């Protein structure tokens, strides 16, 4: 009986301690939604593991698909090309901008990016979201 009385007393006392009449202005509170980046096919695990896997797979993709345009190589045309693109809400790549280098180098870089496989799209608030990215390409012939 004494235990029940002490428990009841404890519950009553703690309810007074935590009771609040004024919750404050809810408009001042902000909810921050975390952006979840796209996921490369076959990548799994924690967010950090998926991001690491994505970066590794993208690097492998670039290395295995990289070709130096023949005309540019033969003429010792070199340069840095940056391809800006987005992964749309369906997981496909859409080129936004290609800058640097000449037309041939730009087309080669663009082709590599367009060969990226369908990804699991990025998410925010549980909904698919377009995610923008940029990838630099350095074209060097190592000729003198």
For each feature predicted by the language model, list its residue ranges.
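N-terminal secretory signal peptides that target proteins for export/translocation
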Residues: 1-2
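Charge-biased low-complexity segments
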Residues: 6-7, 17-144
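Repetitive helical segments and hydrophobic/amphipathic motifs
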Residues: 12-13
């Amino acid at each position: 009986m004494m235990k029940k009385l002490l428990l009841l007393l404890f519950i009553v006392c703690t309810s007074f301690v935590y009771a609040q009449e004024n919750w404050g202005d809810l408009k001042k509170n902000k909810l921050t939604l975390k952006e979840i980046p796209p996921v490369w096919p076959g990548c799994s695990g924690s967010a950090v593991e998926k991001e690491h896997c994505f970066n590794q797979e993208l690097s492998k993709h670039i290395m295995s698909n990289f070709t130096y345009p023949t005309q540019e190589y033969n003429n010792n045309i070199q340069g840095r090309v940056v391809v800006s693109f987005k992964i749309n809400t369906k997981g496909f790549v859409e080129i936004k901008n290609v800058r640097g280098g000449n037309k041939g180098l730009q087309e080669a870089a663009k082709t590599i990016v367009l060969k990226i496989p369908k990804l699991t799209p990025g998410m925010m608030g549980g909904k698919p979201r377009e995610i923008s990215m940029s990838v630099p390409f350095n074209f060097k012939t190592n000729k003198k």
